[in-house]
Each structure stands twice: as C-alpha cells, then as structure tokens.
C-alpha cells in the first residue's frame, strides 16, 4: 500500500475510534482481536467431536430442534451442567413451564445456582434473555422453547383470533437486538425449537421449525436431534437411542452426525460413547465379547465395561482425553464459509 493510502486509512481509523470508541474497528492480527472460539461441552463426546471444536461455541446463537421426547431439553441440561463444572453461571428461561428440577439434578445441574425464569409472554421471555446476556455475567442461557414464546397480543386476545406472523416478527426483532450483545458478552444462547408439518408439500421434507426464518439465519449452529430406537433390559425399556445431525455449523464443517444413548433418569451415557469411540479409534481392544485397555481386560460385554468405567472414572477420563487429543483440532479454530440448509417458514 502506498504512503498516501496508508495515511488516509490511518486518518479514517482515528476518526472511527474518536466517534465510536476504542476497539470499534481493529485488525485481526491485533492482540485485542479474539480469534480462538471457546466451546462448552455438550456432555456427549461424539457430539463434541461432530461439532468440530469440542462443544457448542460461546458468543453465538444455537438452535436445537426435533420431535417430542427426542432429548432436546436433556441435551441443554447437560450443557448447563458442563458450564457449571467450569465455574460458569447458567440461566434457564422456561417458557413451556415444564422444567423438572429433580431430573435436572440427576444430570449434574446445580439447581441451587441455576437461574430460572418462567415468563408470562414471549416479549417478557426475550427481554429477560437480553438483560441476562447484557449483564456479561452469564455463560449459558437456554430458552425452552421458541414455540412457547406466545406474543402478548395473542395472550390478551380471544382463543380463535388470527395472529398471522406475530411470533416470527417477535423472533426477528429479538434476534436483531440479541446478536451483538451475545458476541460482546461471550454468552452462549440456546433456543430449543419444535417441529411442525407444512401442508401440501409434494417434494422434499414437509417438516419446518416454528418462529419464522430469522433463527435459521442468526444461529451459528443448528442441531437436529431424533430418537432412533429403544434401549431394553429384558422387556423393560431403560432409555433411547439418539441421533444428532449438525445441520448448520459456522465454526467447523457441518453435516456431521453423532449417535449416543440417553438412559432414563441418568441422561447421556458418556461411558457407552467412550467404549464405542475407543474401539473405533483403537484405544480399546475388542476380542469377541471381551474388551481390553492397555493390555488389561476390563470386562465381558458392553454393559459390564460400562459399569467398570462408571466405577473407575480415572480410566474413563484417560480414554476420553486420548480420543479428544486425536480427533479434535489443535490450537485456534477458524470458521469456514457458512453452509446452511434453506427451509421455507410456516409463517
């Protein structure tokens, strides 16, 4: 760059900083420009690896959607528990009024420190979310769910009244306000969403999410979570087989998948994932029904090995650390070009 252009740029930067404050524009090579993306573990080793950075990114909007009883709230409660383990503060905006504190505690959530709000209207829920984010003291905010964010006009109106596009407009306006604050405060905001069917769709998927299109654009990560089968012990069903697809990812390559078990009353079976990934990556040897680690037999059959790892958390952590070290990128994560799956809105 020639001297005149350098002087012109320096003058422009000085003027911008004078008018809008120091740090309003900076070079990415400067010390103040943060390039590494911090992540919070999801509680699932396979999903952490599928997300490419070891969890959900901080300072971003996340959307988790899926059918009923697929594990959406369970997954967010695990994220809250992992954040609290690192000394973080978490908030749960319970628009559905369906949070089970006993179940949350079983998943490792510290209910004493968890901030819970049960708002009356969608506007109130999103205003509370914005204020928590702007405080800069909250690490994770979960909104459960977008479908339950009822606009004030709808609550005050009659049951049969038509309110076309009200929720979509509410979400669009809220996300415009929220996004900048979320980035500045480095808070992770997770929206849980439900699925609806579009009528008259001949080709492609008839499924869509509620609340319009805005969330699809503003979300850095979108996770599609599905129940794929039942886990049985004899005739008794003790859990769900779950599959999560990373539909959109702005911080790592998208379209990866993770499969894990959700056990009733326990949540995500981390030990089950460690066994599967340990065998796949060669850290655990499987010979017939026997499993071995570092030359020592640790059990016959997956259930026995799972129990062994539950009783010996040190070994489980050592195997997990080796898997993460091998499969997760070292150093800073640079975001690739966005890849999105366009879906028309119901609104």
UniProtKB/Swiss-Prot annotation:
SMART domains: AAA (SM00382). GO terms for biological process: DNA recombination; DNA repair; SOS response. GO terms for molecular function: ATP binding; ATP hydrolysis activity; ATP-dependent DNA damage sensor activity; damaged DNA binding; single-stranded DNA binding. InterPro entries: AAA+_ATPase, DNA_recomb/repair_RecA, DNA_recomb/repair_RecA_CS, P-loop_NTPase, RecA-like_C, RecA-like_N, RecA_ATP-bd, RecA_C_sf. Keywords: ATP-binding, Cytoplasm, DNA damage, DNA recombination, DNA repair, DNA-binding, Nucleotide-binding, SOS response. ATP binds at residues 66-73. GO terms for cellular component: cytosol. Pfam families: RecA (PF00154), RecA_C (PF21096). Transmembrane segments: none annotated. It is found in: Cytoplasm. CDD domains: RecA. Belongs to the RecA family. Can catalyze the hydrolysis of ATP in the presence of single-stranded DNA, the ATP-dependent uptake of single-stranded DNA by duplex DNA, and the ATP-dependent hybridization of homologous single-stranded DNAs. It interacts with LexA causing its activation and leading to its autocatalytic cleavage. This is Protein RecA. It comes from Allochromatium vinosum.
């Amino acid at each position: 760059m020639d001297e005149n252009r350098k002087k012109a740029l320096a003058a422009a930067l000085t003027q911008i900083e004078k008018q809008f404050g120091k740090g309003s524009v900076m070079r990415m090579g400067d010390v103040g420009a943060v390039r590494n993306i911090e992540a919070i573990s999801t509680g699932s080793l396979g999903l952490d690896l599928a997300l490419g950075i070891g969890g959900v990114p901080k300072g971003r909007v996340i959307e988790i959607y899926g059918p009923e009883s697929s594990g959406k709230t369970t997954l967010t409660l695990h994220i809250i528990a992992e954040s609290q383990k690192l000394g973080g503060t978490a908030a749960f905006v319970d628009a559905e009024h369906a949070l089970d504190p006993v179940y949350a505690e079983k998943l490792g959530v510290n209910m004493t420190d968890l901030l819970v709000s049960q708002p009356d209207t969608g506007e109130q829920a999103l205003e509370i979310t914005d204020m928590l984010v702007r405080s800069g003291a909250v690490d994770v905010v979960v909104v459960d769910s977008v479908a339950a964010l009822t606009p004030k006009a709808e609550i005050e109106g009659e049951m049969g009244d038509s309110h076309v596009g009200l929720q979509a407009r509410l979400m669009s306006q809220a996300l415009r306000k929220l996004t900048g604050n979320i980035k500045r405060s480095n808070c992770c905001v997770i929206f849980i969403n439900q699925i609806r069917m579009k009528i008259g769709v001949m080709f492609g998927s008839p499924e869509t999410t509620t609340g319009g299109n805005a969330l699809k654009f503003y979300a850095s990560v979108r996770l599609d979570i599905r129940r794929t089968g039942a886990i049985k012990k004899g005739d008794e069903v003790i859990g769900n087989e779950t599959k999560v697809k990373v539909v959109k990812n702005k911080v790592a390559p998208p379209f990866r998948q993770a499969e894990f078990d959700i056990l009733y009353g326990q949540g995500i079976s981390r030990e089950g994932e460690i066994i599967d990934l340990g065998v796949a990556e060669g850290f655990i040897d499987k010979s017939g029904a026997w499993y071995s680690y570092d030359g020592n037999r640790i059990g016959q059959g997956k259930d026995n090995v799972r129990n062994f790892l539950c009783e010996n958390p040190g070994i489980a952590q050592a195997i997990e650390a080796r898997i993460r070290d091998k499969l997760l990128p070292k150093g800073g994560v640079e975001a690739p070009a966005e890849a999105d799956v366009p879906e028309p809105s119901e609104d």
